[in-house]
Amino acid sequence: MARIAGVDLPRDKRIVIGLTYIFGIGNTTAQKILKDAEVSEDIRVRDLTADQEDKIRAEVDNYLVEGDLRRTVSLNIKRLQEIGSYRGMRHRRGLPVRGQHTKNNARTRKGKKVSIAGRKK
């Protein structure tokens, strides 16, 4: 099993798909990495040579992935909250950040409905 950026890639998948298991690498980035490393997208992870793995590792090191990317994102959110911006307030309250309406939807961000218990008529 190839280990790149601290992630074990599944052996049976094509390398272009296997790279997307790394947080921060999507399909387009995976294709770009393989093109720069001069490795075919159709090779299975189990068929990679050590030289090809090293080339891919060197290319992935040029990108912000896994723990570093997670840390950067969380620090950005924390910064928005500290400066008191509108987006920071929305993050703090657990509401949608990008201008969506919340009258009816936004259940994913707001969580389960909380019924008003014990309310008499």
From Swiss-Prot:
What Pfam families is this protein classified in? Ribosomal_S13
Q: List the disulfide bonds.
A: none
Coiled coil feature spans:
none
Q: Which SUPFAM superfamilies match?
A: S13-like H2TH domain (SSF46946)
Family membership, please give it: Belongs to the universal ribosomal protein uS13 family.
PANTHER family per UniProt: 30S RIBOSOMAL PROTEIN S13/40S RIBOSOMAL PROTEIN S18 (PTHR10871), SMALL RIBOSOMAL SUBUNIT PROTEIN US13M (PTHR10871:SF1)
User: What are the protein's UniProt keywords?
Assistant: Ribonucleoprotein, Ribosomal protein, RNA-binding, rRNA-binding, tRNA-binding
Q: Which GO terms describe its molecular function?
A: rRNA binding; structural constituent of ribosome; tRNA binding
Subunit organization:
Part of the 30S ribosomal subunit. Forms a loose heterodimer with protein S19. Forms two bridges to the 50S subunit in the 70S ribosome.
Q: Where is this region: Disordered?
A: 89-121
Where does the sequence pass through the membrane?
Answer: none
Highest taxon above the source species: Bacteria
Q: Which organism is it from?
A: Pediococcus pentosaceus (strain ATCC 25745 / CCUG 21536 / LMG 10740 / 183-1w)
Main function: Located at the top of the head of the 30S subunit, it contacts several helices of the 16S rRNA. In the 70S ribosome it contacts the 23S rRNA (bridge B1a) and protein L5 of the 50S subunit (bridge B1b), connecting the 2 subunits; these bridges are implicated in subunit movement. Contacts the tRNAs in the A and P-sites.
Q: What is this protein called?
A: Small ribosomal subunit protein uS13
UniProt-listed HAMAP family: Ribosomal_uS13 (MF_01315)
Listed under GO biological process in this entry are:
translation
What gene name is listed for this protein? rpsM
Q: Which GO terms describe its cellular component?
A: cytosol; small ribosomal subunit
